[in-house]
Amino acid sequence: MEISTLQIIAIFIFSCIAGMGSVLDEFQTHRPLIACTVIGLILGDLKTGVMLGGTLELIALGWMNVGAAQSPDSALASIISAILVIVGHQSIAIGIAIALPVAAAGQVLTVFARTITVVFQHAADKAAEEARFRTIDLLHVSALGVQGLRVAIPALVVSLFVSADMVSSMLSAIPEFVTRGLQIAGGFIVVVGYAMVLRMMGVKYLMPFFFLGFLAGGYLDFSLLAFGGVGVIIALIYIQLNPQWRKAEPAASTAPSAPALDQLDD
């Protein structure tokens, strides 16, 4: 599959938006589910984009910045892996093996880009002292543009030079135990991501359902739609039986009968 010039331009524009979205966190364009889906739509393979994005989204559930520590770059990993998988006609498992090291490399690029933006912030402080508000706006937009180019430039390079033969040759050069290990690690990261989210939410009472889901997934030959339906049914039953969600029934008050009143009078 060859990428056309129009597709390359569209990938570059969306990569800029995804890179800026990883800082703004408003429209979540940097999340794998959105990024891979849009790349799949641009390259004409929406199904593969959605499948890869959904798989990577599960892996990236636990990726979050903690203080000055930067998380792996989900935007760069999603876009690069989606391009290589769709153009090279590779499997979703290969996409996971590609995304993990790319996310680690993007983490380094993120730190480098944030270091560069410090220069813009100092310049904005100086402009604020001189009441040059248009300069402040320009510096803020320029700093945001650095974050966009952080993802767009690697995506542009890959889009310009990638081909199906190149992807196959590159993957053939990687030892099988490396790609297999990355695929297994990707499966473990999904579990760890779910566990981190549940622990952060502080809902220990949901842990039995967490383990029940993985046991059912391992031993029952159900489709995802069937698992979703079973999950909804269990959730509804749980809400109906849990005293926390049940409305308190008003106590019935009955007036004493006439004979009872007569006995009290006696």
Curated annotation (Swiss-Prot):
Q: Which residues form the PTS EIIC type-4 domain?
A: 1-237
Comment text on domains: The EIIC type-4 domain forms the PTS system translocation channel and contains the specific substrate-binding site.
Does the entry feature the keyword Zinc, yes or no? Answer: no
Q: Subcellular localization, per the record?
A: Cell inner membrane
**Induction data:** By L-sorbose.
Q: What does this protein do?
A: The phosphoenolpyruvate-dependent sugar phosphotransferase system (PTS), a major carbohydrate active transport system, catalyzes the phosphorylation of incoming sugar substrates concomitant with their translocation across the cell membrane. The enzyme II SorABFM PTS system is involved in L-sorbose transport.
The primary gene name is sorA
Biological process (GO) annotations held by this record are: phosphoenolpyruvate-dependent sugar phosphotransferase system
Bilayer disposition of the protein? Multi-pass membrane protein
Report the leader peptide range.
none
List UniProt keywords, sorted A-Z: Cell inner membrane, Cell membrane, Membrane, Phosphotransferase system, Sugar transport, Transmembrane, Transmembrane helix, Transport
InterPro entries reported in the protein's UniProt record: GatZ_KbaZ_carbometab, PTS_IIC_man
Task: Tell me which GO cellular component terms the UniProt record holds.
Answer: plasma membrane
User: Per the record, a Pfam family?
Assistant: EII-Sor
**Protein name stated in the entry:** PTS system sorbose-specific EIIC component
UniProt feature coiled coil, ranges: none
Give the residue spans that cross the bilayer. Answer: 3-23, 33-53, 79-99, 100-120, 151-171, 183-203, 219-239
